[in-house]
Amino acid sequence: MASSAGSAASGSVVPGGGGSAASSCATMALSTAGSGGPPVNHAHAVCVWEFESRGKWLPYSPAVSQHLERAHAKKLTRVMLSDADPSLEQYYVNVRTMTQESEAETAGSGLLTIGVRRMFYAPSSPAGKGTKWEWSGGSADSNNDWRPYNMHVQCIIEDAWARGEQTLDLCNTHIGLPYTINFCNLTQLRQPSGPMRSIRRTQQAPYPLVKLTPQQANQLKSNSASVSSQYNTLPKLGDTKSLHRVPMTRQQHPLPTSHQVQQQQHQHQHQQQQQQQHHHQHQQQQHQQQQQHQMQHHQIHHQTAPRKPPKKHSEISTTNLRQILNNLNIFSSSTKHQSNMSTAASASSSSSSASLHHANHLSHAHFSHAKNMLTASMNSHHSRCSEGSLQSQRSSRMGSHRSRSRTRTSDTDTNSVKSHRRRPSVDTVSTYLSHESKESLRSRNFAISVNDLLDCSLGSDEVFVPSLPPSSLGERAPVPPPLPLHPRQQQQQQQQQQQLQMQQQQQAQQQQQQSIAGSIVGVDPASDMISRFVKVVEPPLWPNAQPCPMCMEELVHSAQNPAISLSRCQHLMHLQCLNGMIIAQQNEMNKNLFIECPVCGIVYGEKVGNQPIGSMSWSIISKNLPGHEGQNTIQIVYDIASGLQTEEHPHPGRAFFAVGFPRICYLPDCPLGRKVLRFLKIAFDRRLLFSIGRSVTTGREDVVIWNSVDHKTQFNMFPDPTYLQRTMQQLVHLGVTD
């Protein structure tokens, strides 16, 4: 978001930017009034402020959204964006009119005004997890000029990415954009033969979390369920109601929405249905011939064999047959044939109802006829969906065998095809502290997981996380139910299922005990270094109960979000809250993992600061410090030169000033003094002793200042009996230990 408002002013075109400002197609977020206060309830959502760019809504950066959200809560009118992002120095937002305006007024042109809106997204969305999807404005080989996607498009891309899909066709989603995303090489291709551009998934700070009113929470929940059932894309978002939009003077032609695409598909399907009527009549004639053949075979069989009573488990009703035929669309190669499949299935089931009624007293003929009908329907479906035509109609016996084998193996085939087609879920660099049970993995859906505590993804694709279990895949793509089996086969199948369920329950209980009992253990050296400071504990009960210091919710022990304590300070908090704080603390220039207690500020792990480049040297001088007679003195010299601030400093690109350097400090030459010197060297190497900010003495900005470690710069500052112990404690609080 280095130049979000600037791109809006220049009219940059954003592929995959979502629906236009005039018609936001099937969006799933809530917008609020510009003058209203913040929502108040126990339901939470992530608040994202967005601006209009050539008919598309793009998100501000998390820092700008946080700045605007604070101004919105205080009911301010005019908010300068440069306070949060220096690159937006000429822009401000009018919170009452929900517009962004520019202070750079030119003669005869007036102010440049664009629309602004305030949106709510689920905490499990990319905005809440601190991830961001961007596309390159240059060619596929270019690595600069990265531009963010529309937030709704980011939700869909993140959903496909989390499922481990290789490609994502945005035409088949509810937004209906002509783009295909390739997750294997991280590229975006415009259909049918447009340019190819690079994409990337980066980490950023999460957007601010707010509370919703009961009406907004109910609407968020209802719209999430409806959109999820209709599109099977990322749910958990609300409905969109844009309250204020400034008309744009120049707009692109809006991209086709999902409703227009569905109309085109419906017209194409209607033409195909007329062509298939003749083919379906031919299939009915073949069905009648197969029925006569089965009736003759059954009469011969009953003349030579004793008659048996009909079995209830082998009967297949018309409704069950229709359900089986409708579920055969898993073999389809294109989503455009789903409506044709439903029509053919209904016609086949209706034509078979008369023959089923006629042969109701003959169970064997009834069962064979049902299998033949299923085989014919599958052949008819394959003739419509496959690229090449199949061979001519086989005999009824071969068709029945193929139908039985396909039906019984459909469960494993579908999952194996999915698992073979799945690429490993490349969630960049994700490490885990505890093992999670399968029940919690299925129940969390897209919510923030306990395993995300050490999620420090920075856009790298080198580390792979385990794929989702087949059970979760089966929930998204149900397989067709198999035909009734022999009682012995049914008993064997039930016994196998019971044994499998018992094994899964035992494994889940063992994993749950391992994840809760004792210290949390990671899976790589980095997580082991930080997880040894975290331990799962039982929170105190009422009246000694205490809230989490970050979310202010009551600490209640649960497997999904257990209560943890830090080793040295013993402060309690939620594991998911600690996870969110660690993700927010991550920096692209800093890959070290550390925990900083939100209550007392004690650091666990190796924290790296933003100290400017400099040098530290020391020497022994033969002079006694007051209170340390008979001991030499350690003289420490810090030297830092003035320069320019980088991205890790408060004002990147602005000059900073090293005032009063070189600075000379003193320590007594004793065992504890030498240990303090060693810890000071470690802290200096981790860039923790100095920072850039406002001077306490002069009040000047952008100068090098001391951090929280005391130094003695004069001999007359001694004696101080507790100085060395106090300095050691301050260094330990910064994470500097043996």
UniProtKB/Swiss-Prot annotation:
Reactions accelerated catalytically: S-ubiquitinyl-[E2 ubiquitin-conjugating enzyme]-L-cysteine + [acceptor protein]-L-lysine = [E2 ubiquitin-conjugating enzyme]-L-cysteine + N(6)-ubiquitinyl-[acceptor protein]-L-lysine
InterPro entries for this protein: Deltex_C, Deltex_C_sf, Deltex_fam, WWE-dom_subgr, WWE_dom, WWE_dom_sf, Znf_RING, Znf_RING/FYVE/PHD
User: Where do the record's region annotations for Interaction with Notch lie?
Assistant: 1-304
**Top-level taxon of the source organism:** Eukaryota
Record annotation: effect of changing residue 571 to A: Loss of function. Abolishes homomultimerization
ZnF regions (RING-type) run across 548-603
Motif mapping: SH3-binding? 480-484
**Gene Ontology terms describing biological process:** endocytosis; negative regulation of canonical Wnt signaling pathway; negative regulation of Notch signaling pathway; Notch receptor processing; Notch signaling pathway; positive regulation of canonical Wnt signaling pathway; positive regulation of endocytosis; positive regulation of Notch signaling pathway
Instruction: Give one GO molecular function term.
Output: ubiquitin protein ligase activity
Q: What is its main location?
A: cytoplasm
Q: What is its EC number?
A: 2.3.2.27
Which tissues is this chain's protein expressed in? Answer: Ubiquitous. Expressed at low levels throughout embryogenesis and in larvae.
Q: Which residues are annotated with the PTM Phosphoserine? A: 425
Q: Which residues form the WWE domain?
A: 35-118, 119-201
Q: Which family does it belong to?
A: Belongs to the Deltex family.
Quaternary structure annotation from Swiss-Prot or TrEMBL: Homomultimer; the oligomerization is required for its function. Interacts with the ankyrin repeats of Notch.
Q: What is this protein called?
A: Protein deltex
Which species is this record about? Drosophila melanogaster
